[in-house]
Amino acid sequence: MVKLRLKRCGRKQRAVYRIVAIDVRSRREGRDLRKVGFYDPINNQTYLNVPAILYFLEKGAQPTATVHDILKKAGVFTELTLNQTKFT
């Protein structure tokens, strides 16, 4: 199973996080499948690769609670519902 979660980078006492798609069994600093974003909590900066995030969400990736809040604030889930079409 794949999750979208935060991977810690940066210096001591100055954390910066990458938002990555990673296997659920991997460690926090383990090998990721793809880097899909960036989050700096101190400067409150966020960069998201929305097409890559939508790709992983459509394939069944589960975001963690913190990543879910970041994506919700950026409006990614509204784009996800607009991209889904009903097949009859």
Curated annotation (Swiss-Prot):
Domain of life of the organism encoding this protein: Eukaryota
GO BP annotations, alphabetical order: translation
Signal peptide: none
Pfam families tied to this protein: Ribosomal_S16
A single MF term (Gene Ontology): structural constituent of ribosome
One Gene Ontology cellular component annotation held by this UniProt entry: small ribosomal subunit
Subcellular location: Plastid, Chloroplast
Keyword field: Chloroplast, Plastid, Ribonucleoprotein, Ribosomal protein
Disulfide bonds listed in the record: none
UniProt KW Ribonucleoprotein keyword: yes
Family: Belongs to the bacterial ribosomal protein bS16 family.
HAMAP family: Ribosomal_bS16
Protein name in the entry: Small ribosomal subunit protein bS16c
Source species: Gossypium hirsutum
Lineage: Eukaryota, Viridiplantae, Streptophyta, Embryophyta, Tracheophyta
